[in-house]
Design a protein with these regions (language model features):
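Terminal, low-structured helical/coil segments at or just beyond the last alpha-helical repeat
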Residues: 140-158
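Bacterial N-terminal signal peptides
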Residues: 12-21
Length: 158
C-alpha cells in the first residue's frame, strides 16, 4: 500500500541525508590534511608547523612531527624550531647528535626572540655541565619575561 511506500521513502531520505552529511566531512578532513601537506611542501611555514602539531598531538608520531617542525623551522616559523628542539632534546642525551641538532634549532629561535627556546638552551647547557652558558641563556629568557628562566638563573647564580 501507499503507507509502506511513504515509510520506505522517509527511511531512504534519512539514510541519504546522513550519507550526504557525514561522507563529505570525512573527505574534507582528509583534504585539509592534504592541503596542509601540499602547502608545507611549497614552503608554507605555518602549514608545516600545523602538520608537526597534528603528528605530535593527534597521531602521537614524534618522528614525523619532527620532520614537519624542521621544515617549519627552516621556513622561518620559530615555534617550529622550539618544538622540534624539544622533541630532539627529549630523545637525546647530553653530547649526542640529537642534542647538537636541538641546540641549533633552539639557537635559531632564541636569536629570533623565542624565550622558551632560550630557556631550553639554558637547560641543554646545564645538562652538559656548562653552567656559565646555562646562566647566560636563562638570563636571556628571563629578560624576555620567562619566569622559569628568572628562577633558574637565580638558583644557579647562588
Amino acid at each position: 500500500g501507499k503507507e509502506v511506500d511513504v515509510k520506505y521513502f522517509i527511511k531512504a531520505m534519512v539514510i541519504l541525508m546522513t550519507i550526504t552529511i557525514f561522507v563529505p566531512a570525512a573527505l574534507a578532513e582528509q583534504t585539509q590534511e592534504e592541503r596542509l601537506e601540499a602547502l608545507c611542501t611549497e614552503g608554507n611555514s605555518t602549514a608545516c608547523f600545523k602538520m608537526g602539531e597534528r603528528y605530535r598531538v593527534v597521531e602521537r608520531d614524534k618522528k614525523t612531527a619532527l620532520k614537519f617542525y624542521e621544515k617549519a623551522c627552516d621556513a622561518g616559523y620559530m615555534t617550529g624550531c622550539t618544538n622540534g628542539g624539544i622533541l630532539l632534546a627529549m630523545k637525546g642525551t647530553p653530547y649526542s647528535k640529537d642534542f647538537k641538532q636541538a641546540r641549533k634549532m633552539f639557537d635559531k629561535a632564541c636569536e629570533a626572540g623565542e624565550d622558551p627556546a632560550c630557556y631550553n638552551l639554558g637547560t641543554l647547557n646545564y645538562k652538559e655541565g656548562r653552567q656559565k652558558k646555562a646562566i647566560k641563556y636563562y638570563k636571556k629568557a628571563c629578560d624576555m619575561g620567562n619566569q622559569g628562566g628568572c628562577a633558574k638563573e637565580k638558583r644557579l647564580k647562588r
